[in-house]
Amino acid sequence: MCGIVGAIAQRDVAEILLEGLRRLEYRGYDSAGLAVVDAEGHMTRLRRLGKVQMLAQAAEEHPLHGGTGIAHTRWATHGEPSEANAHPHVSEHIVVVHNGIIENHEPLREALKARGYTFVSETDTEVIAHLVNWELKQGGTLREAVLRAIPQLRGAYGTVIMDTRHPDTLLAARSGSPLVIGLGMGENFIASDQLALLPVTRRFIFLEEGDIAEITRRSVNIFDNTGAEVKRQDIESNLQYDAGDKGIYRHYMQKEIYEQPNAIKNTLTGRISHGQVDLSELGPNADELLSKVEHIQILACGTSYNSGMVSRYWFESLAGIPCDVEIASEFRYRKSAVRRNSLMITLSQSGETADTLAGLRLSKELGYLGSLAICNVPGSSLVRESDLALMTNAGTEIGVASTKAFTTQLTVLLMLVAKLSRLKGLDASIEHDIVHGLQALPSRIEQMLSQDKRIELLAEDFSDKHHALFLGRGDQYPIALEGALKLKEISYIHAEAYAAGELKHGPLALIDADMPVIVVAPNNELLEKLKSNIEEVRARGGQLYVFADQDAGFVSSDNMHIIEMPHVEEVIAPIFYTVPLQLLAYHVALIKGTDVDQPRNLAKSVTVE
């Protein structure tokens, strides 16, 4: 959601800012802008509704010269998508970009109007610009003005501020929205995501909650919200921006679906040794903590929530550990009873999901045994703030609709199940079966991907549909949830998922010839029950699309289309059956003509509530 890039250097920084914004496009946005100041304090600001490319074209027509600048991609919250609402926002000589939501912007706006300030946008960000301007008029430096302004803001923010009268300094403040400083030689940078800065530096400082940073070409000084100087460690990043080229694929999502066999191989690399799962990366004290676990609480949002739902079946049936999964935005606003020796597991592709982070922070006050993050971004807030962390190593995921991040999360979770089963002294065959299944998984998915053309033809049946129903049983029910989420995200077809046994409790009323019903049907102990549910749909004229194990005994008929899947080990079946549903959603979206990689109203990383 939104993106920030800032730079202060001796050279012109406009192209650095634009390239940074291009690398943040995957996060989702509706407008873009930048402001550059030269050594004499002359500021040029450009803003455009639409893509970064439109902003870049404007910059070609109106060349920008200056060594200090800030840039932003906006995902509308307060105020419609428009050029007037695009960042940066200006109050005389104060220029501001901001990610997050200022919850008390309305009373602040009224107070500032009473002081004579005029607002030209509908955004909460303009409040920050005028507030800093007002505080600066009361005396002191820009840093002192920011220190006085920040406590007046309620909500989440990551903001970068410059004063055109002093173009040798940038100020940044972070509370609930990530910011990272990039360190150069005689130049420094700041962004909301380190990906934006990889072309110019590999050295980073991640700001912590409440930090305020004063950045010049040759120095970075960081203060807490009382104004006391603090030290933050700089790190060398080995993160690769390896997804910038779609190659032979039409969309990043398609590319990332096809990358899943290799992504899972990367997830497994170095983590299986002598037939056992090796998670020694967790550190020397991890086994002591994990051996005490009597309950697992999982927090996540969106696709990550669905992966947590799958793992609940695994933790309970394979490791014998009770597990609860909760939507992070619900967990943080209710009073919960913490089970004894409960491990908090958080799931997030980006590691910056606002509600998940807030849930993690809350859990530290509630007496959990410890916390473990499963994440795709090293150095992210979730990773830094958790006791333990496991990286999915999926590589950069650009498409807003998650694919390889989901399957690699499940891969890590299944390895964790194996590890816990061993620590609990359970039968060694449990870990053996998990390891065997995971080692076979990449080749199984490659087999499945060979059916892409058949699924593409199937997708044509959905071209005129407005609704769809997904069904699954057991650990395939969360896969049905994920399939429905993918379809609605990128094709804009209203899709819902149900546990198949719930059909008679309401959803059966929806069944008619215009309601496609998608079913996942591996050959497991629930297959006969599932077949009964399928017959209930057939009897009412529903159009069935069944992704079934080749040995499940299904036969196609007029209103039941069988898509045979290769037989796979039961333990990896949820991961495997995810992939055809991803392909179905992708091809339906192509037929519908939607923006597959950046679907309307959605953002890749949800860094606000």
Curated annotation (Swiss-Prot):
Main location: cytoplasm
Top enzyme class: transferase
Swiss-Prot/TrEMBL catalytic activity: D-fructose 6-phosphate + L-glutamine = D-glucosamine 6-phosphate + L-glutamate
Domain SIS: 286-426, 458-599
UniProt GO MF annotations: carbohydrate derivative binding; glutamine-fructose-6-phosphate transaminase (isomerizing) activity
Annotated GO CC locations: cytosol
Protein's cellular compartments: Cytoplasm
PANTHER family: GLUCOSAMINE--FRUCTOSE-6-PHOSPHATE AMINOTRANSFERASE, ISOMERIZING (PTHR10937), GLUTAMINE--FRUCTOSE-6-PHOSPHATE TRANSAMINASE (ISOMERIZING) (PTHR10937:SF0)
Protein name according to UniProt: Glutamine--fructose-6-phosphate aminotransferase [isomerizing]
Gene for this chain: glmS
